C-alpha cells in the first residue's frame, strides 16, 4: 500500500506541540512526534529529514523499543513507512558524507527490525533525494547504497569477509525518490523519471516522484509554481502509460496558498486541485495549529479519497511577464523580508550553513530566508506573497489560469484578507494595491492594523500567525 499521508518536519507551526520539551523541536521530541503522527493522527508515512537538520539516526531502534505494542500491530516498513530525506552531494557539498552515513543507517535499522519482528523486514527502503536535476543524481544514490553498503559485505578484511565478521546488509537495494524543486527540474521531471525507470525496469514494481510546491512558488510566484507542478504531474502520467510501471506522485504542501493550501479545513480543495497525487504531506502547522479531532478527521478524509486523472496543462506564454513582475517586486521587498525574518521564531533545530539566515535561499542573486520564514515575513507586514505580480495579470488571463488552477480565485481571496494597501503603497507597490482593490476583498481589520505596526518595526508577529492560522 502506497502511503496517502506523509507527516513531515517542516517548521510552519505557531503552536508548541503538547509533548515538546522546548519551542524548538529536536531529538527526542521528534521521536515522539513520529509516533504521534502514526498512532494518533493516522499518517501512514513519516519523513525523517537529514537535509540540513539534526535528527536522530537511531529513530527506528527508539521507536521499536519505546512503543513495542503499536509497532507489533503496525509493521514499520510494511503497514507504515519511515522515509529519510538525504542531502544531495551535487548541491550540498558540506553535507555530502552524511548521505553515506544515512545509507549505512538503513542496514543498521534493518538489523533492529529483524530482532524486533523475528523476520527480515526493512523498516526503511526508500530515500528522498532533494534538488534532483538529472537521472545521474538518482542513479548515484542507488548505486552508492549497493556498492558502499551491500556489496562491501563481500570484501575480505585481513583474514575474514565483512559478511562473516559483521553480518549481511539488508535490504539488498533501495528505492530513490527524486524531489523536483526548480522550474527547470519540473520541466525535465518526466524525462528524468522515464530514464530512471528504463534503467531500473527489471528491478522496480513502481516509482515514486516528489514535487515541491514551496520553493517554486517562492522563486517564481504562486501561479508559475502551480502551473509547472501540474504540468509535471500530467507529463509523468504519460510516462506511466508508456512504460506500464505505476508512478505515484508526492506533493509537498503547507498551510498558506503559496505553499499549497494544505490546512485541515481545506483538504477537499487541495485533493481536488491535485487529483493524481498519491501522497500529500501534512506539515507542522497542519498537525499542531488546529484541534486534534479536526486534524484526524481531515487525515481520514484524504485517506478515503481515490486518485483521479491529472488536469491537462499547457504553459501560458503570459507567465513570462508574470515572473518578471514577481522578481521585480521581490527585489523591492527583500530588505523588508530580511528585516522581519529575524523576528520569526525558530521551530526546528537546523544545522548552520554559511549565509545570512543559516540555511537560506538565493533567488536571482538576492539572499532570502527559506520558504516558511519568507512567507511568514511577508504575511507579517500585510503583503501575502500569493498576491505578488497579480497586477501583471488581466481578468482574461486569470480566467485562462482558472481552467487548470481550480482554486485560484479562492486562494487569492484567502490571501487578500490579510493584505494592507497602505503598506503596499509605502514600499512602492501601488499598482499591486490598486489591482487587489478591484477584487473588493473581505479583509480582517484587526490583522491589517497589527501588520502595519509590524511593518514599522514593532507589533506582534505571533499574534498575526494565530489570526491567520499558520506561521509561514
UniProtKB/Swiss-Prot annotation:
Recorded family membership: Belongs to the PEPCase type 2 family.
Enzyme Commission number, as recorded: 4.1.1.31
Protein name (record): Phosphoenolpyruvate carboxylase
InterPro entries noted in UniProt: PEP_COase_arc-type (IPR007566), Pyrv/PenolPyrv_kinase-like_dom (IPR015813)
Catalysed transformations (reactions): oxaloacetate + phosphate = phosphoenolpyruvate + hydrogencarbonate
GO MF assignments: magnesium ion binding; phosphoenolpyruvate carboxylase activity
Enzyme class per UniProt: lyase
Subunit structure comment from the entry: Homotetramer.
Alphabetic keyword roster: Carbon dioxide fixation, Lyase, Magnesium
Record Pfam families: PEPcase_2 (PF14010)
Membrane as UniProt keyword: no
GO biological process, one term: oxaloacetate metabolic process
Cofactor: Mg(2+)
The protein's role, per its UniProt record: Catalyzes the irreversible beta-carboxylation of phosphoenolpyruvate (PEP) to form oxaloacetate (OAA), a four-carbon dicarboxylic acid source for the tricarboxylic acid cycle.
